[in-house]
């Protein structure tokens, strides 16, 4: 079965960096869903306060069902992350693994 990578790239307000790091730490501890193989956050080299979250799902079905599995605390943290980002900086990418190569 082919995997799915979902990424969210954004910039945060520089004065909110410490708050951002604590929210992401809690989010990493709470993110557990069927079919979610991994979740990682990276800082983009050469771009201060620019980050990318990468979710790896075991299948397209697991990716499609991901929103259904979220609890209230996760939703609060995700909304808080949205409040910390700079306006118009968020970019979403979804990649489907090629299994025939």
What are these regions (language model features)?
Residues 11-22:
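Short, surface-exposed ligand-recognition loops at beta-strand->loop->(often short) alpha-helix junctions
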Residues 13-15, 46, 58-60:
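Short coil/turn motifs at secondary-structure junctions
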Residues 92-101:
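Short, low-order "capping/linker" segments at domain edges
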Residues 30-38, 56-92:
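An amphipathic, aromatic/His-enriched active-site/gating alpha helix that lines ligand/cofactor pockets
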